[in-house]
Design a protein with these regions (language model features):
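Signature of the first transmembrane helix
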Residues: 2-5, 9-11, 25-83, 115-118, ...
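Interfacial segments at transmembrane-helix termini and the short loops linking adjacent helices
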Residues: 126-143, 356-390
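Interfacial/gating helices of multi-pass transporter permease domains
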Residues: 52-72, 197, 201-205, 245-253, ...
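Membrane-proximal transmembrane or re-entrant/amphipathic helices at the cytosolic face
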Residues: 2-13, 489-546
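Membrane-interface junctions at transmembrane-helix termini in multi-pass inner-membrane proteins
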Residues: 151-173, 388-418, 429, 433
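Hydrophobic transmembrane helix module of multi-pass membrane transport proteins
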Residues: 114-266
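Membrane-interface helix-loop junctions in multi-pass transport and translocation proteins
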Residues: 168-169, 179-217, 222, 410, ...
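Helix-loop junctions and terminal segments of transmembrane helices
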Residues: 79-94, 308-332, 400
Length: 546
């Protein structure tokens, strides 16, 4: 008896060690994926700065007319299959069952969908160009169409590797994709700008195609190297075909994922069809309408997206642990982690929004020196309006992620569908009668409405509001903005005002946040840069440590 008990304890201990190892591997893989995603998104946002300086407002308008159509067909070509594949592979791997048949079926479906979407983009290029109100974009659609097929195949490899808990290829492929696009796209557009604007735009789009091709080569190489190593280690998998039931199950899993994924690209697609045409009805020429659309969707949106990417990356890093807490029905843990996600959005989003509103003209003149004074003035006004999207879009997307983590995807879909519908109607009306600023107002309205609905949905599910102290946070943001206005009035040089104002605003905001206790001692261990947070908390709220 003692011997069997001892053996039982040993087996139990071994199982516990294996579970701990698995958890550590998942956490490590998620960390690698998050880092790669942040780097890739930041590179993607930075890419548009030199591109705008080369293409100018009108060229950027052409580029931004083409890209939403490309993004929409890119989502349609994947249809949620990669995410469904990663889940199925992870499940089969955990139970020791073969998963290659799912990978083969997914790759076949992705190749077919990608091929169809690429051909449709190529065939309908003229139609899209006419609908958008700028016939010159026709050539851009022809150039970008092969990338849709390549993206579909790449996404299949990414889904498979993620299901295998091997996150490095996905993280590296994201970075490779952006680096090649940045280097080649900027180089080609610079070399071709002398031949004409559409040539330079096509050069940038060719850079996108080449980046996807290089990424695909990397993913294929990684897959076969891994397969060869597995064979050398004696790992072989029996080839089987999927049953009809398995195909239906995979499709059912992919469908809701695809619905959520397609909504934002669909909104941008509507913008590309509406804004230029409404501006022309407003009385602007085709070139001016394209240039103004380029200012809104290019330099302005790029600046707004930078803090949104950073904020969402920090917040979403906490979201997987919300799913884990839901599995254990730990309500207190769910509320703590959810509140922290949302608090990060407001703590970081509010100062960025006010800073953009105060220093819009300074930022744009420093970052986009090639824009003429009229374009800078229009872009500055657009940025002052769009600055509020930093708060609403980041918080809205965190709420959507939290709802998905709680298996309430239908509420996420409802909030986005309602918001996109309102934005589309407002764009049709406001841009037609007020000009390009109507497009910015419609975008802000969309973010605000989606945030309100998703917030209400979360309250309905959990019974608690998450965003305490938002009023105090807004007051602190106003004080920070006033200090920025003071610096701007004292320093006439835009570069000096921007640099000094940045430092003053950061110091004032951080000091007031800790002074008013918006970050508690209990929350600091869960925040990024914990040591720095502790140091600032001790320095500013020294009486708490007496």
């Amino acid at each position: 008896m003692p011997k069997s008990r001892k053996n039982g304890n040993a087996v139990y201990a071994a199982d516990a060690v294996q579970k701990d190892d698995r958890k550590r591997k998942i956490a490590s893989g998620a960390g690698v994926l998050a880092i790669g995603s942040v780097i890739a998104k930041m590179l993607g946002a930075l890419y548009r700065i030199p591109l705008t300086n080369i293409l100018g407002a009108q060229g950027m308008g052409m580029y931004q007319l083409i890209f939403p159509v490309y993004a929409l067909f890119m989502v349609l070509s994947t249809a949620g299959i990669p995410t469904a594949l990663s889940r199925i592979v992870a499940e089969k791997r955990a139970t020791g069952q073969p998963s290659k048949k799912y990978f083969a079926a997914a790759m076949l479906a992705l190749a077919l969908l990608g091929g169809i979407c690429s051909v449709l983009t190529f065939a309908l290029a003229k139609v899209f160009a006419v609908w958008q109100g700028n016939p010159d974009t026709y050539y851009g659609f022809l150039v970008i169409s092969p990338a849709i097929f390549l993206v579909g195949i790449i996404s299949g490899f990414r889904g498979f590797f993620q299901g295998e808990m091997y996150m490095l290829p996905t993280a590296l492929s994201n970075v490779i994709e952006q680096v090649v696009k940045l280097a080649l796209g900027i180089t080609l557009s610079y070399l071709l700008i002398g031949k004409g604007l559409i040539w330079a735009v096509c050069g940038a789009l060719l850079g996108v195609v080449c980046s996807e091709l290089v990424t695909l080569v990397y993913m294929v190489t990684t897959y076969f190297v891994r397969a060869v190593k597995a064979r050398k280690n004696g790992v072989r998998e029996i080839r089987e075909r999927m049953t009809k039931q398995e195909v239906k199950s995979m499709a059912a899993m992919a469908f809701p994922i695809a619905i959520v994924a397609i909504l934002m690209p669909l909104s941008n697609f509507f913008d590309s069809m509406i804004i230029v045409n409404m501006l022309r009805l407003h009385g602007e020429s085709g070139d001016v309408a394209t240039a103004w659309y380029g200012l809104l969707s290019g330099p302005v949106q790029s600046l707004v997206n930078m803090p949104i990417v950073a904020i969402i990356s920090l917040g979403v890093a906490i979201v997987p642990s919300v799913s884990a807490s839901r599995a254990t029905r730990d309500v207190d843990s769910i509320m703590l982690k959810s509140r922290l996600c949302v608090k990060l959005c407001y703590l970081l989003g509010i100062p960025f929004a006010f800073f953009f509103a105060v220093y819009a003209d300074n930022i744009l003149s420093v970052v986009y020196p090639s824009l003429n004074q009229n374009s800078l003035n229009i872009a500055a006004n657009l940025l002052k309006i769009s600055a509020f999207n930093v708060v609403t879009f980041s918080a809205m997307q965190i709420y959507v992620s939290l709802l998905q983590a709680l298996d309430k995807t239908k509420w996420a879909v409802l909030s986005l569908v309602c918001a996109i519908t309102v934005k589309t109607v407002l764009s049709l009306v406001l841009v037609r009668f007020t000009g390009i600023y109507g497009g910015a107002i419609a975008s802000v309205s969309m973010g605000a409405l989606a945030l309100l609905i998703s917030n209400a949905a979360y309250f309905k599910i959990c019974g608690l509001h998450l965003e305490k102290n938002v009023g105090t946070n807004l007051v602190i943001g106003v004080i920070m903005a006033l200090s920025g206005v003071g610096v701007k009035a004292l320093l006439q040089n835009p570069v000096a005002a921007f640099c000094v104002g940045s430092v003053v605003c950061v110091v004032v905001y951080v000091w007031l946040v800790f002074l008013f206790g918006l970050v508690s001692r209990e929350e600091i261990p869960h925040l990024p840069m914990k040591r720095l947070m502790w140091g600032l908390h001790r320095l500013i709220r020294f009486w708490d440590y007496g």
